[in-house]
Amino acid sequence: TRADGLTKVIKYFMGDVIVNIKQNSICPNIYNHYTGIDPIETKTMINGKLNMPHLIGELCKSFERNLEIVKIIKEKYSQNRKILVLTDRREHCLNLQRLLGDDYSSGIYIGSMKNTALQESNTKRVIFATYYIASEGYDNPKLDTLILASPKSNVEQAVGRILRQENENEPLVIDIVDSFSVLINM
């Protein structure tokens, strides 16, 4: 099933799945980068469960955490990697790009952008995108590094973005892990 809810539409036009092959020819190196940063503020909902959207919002606003992510981006950039940075929030994409600075080839890939702007961003060495827009249907075979800048439980589609590579670098996934107990397993 597709996360975007279009499974029924595709099945209607194309019919049932005949065969499902999991492609295991390329396996990325996966690293967890532990920030040691706890969210400043947590809230619970009426039912007593943790308010995850608020928590993710607080993490994305953390200046110290964002500087740490940008430090990783700069390190991988210096290794001649083509980097996709995924996050849950549009504002986070914009803040990270601003912190990275103009000395680096970077672009934004978020919803509501015109096609020409998206295509231009897709040519950059660092692409900041939301999970939503880059999850299904996004293709850039030159990518070799994925940085998961905000917590996400299902990243299979996201990791697939760097497994279609056309360059010499091995695929690399860097998961930014925060020490808050709920987020460690995401």
Map each language-model feature to its residues.
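Amphipathic alpha-helical transducer elements in NTP-driven molecular machines
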Residues: 4-7, 66-70, 140, 152-156
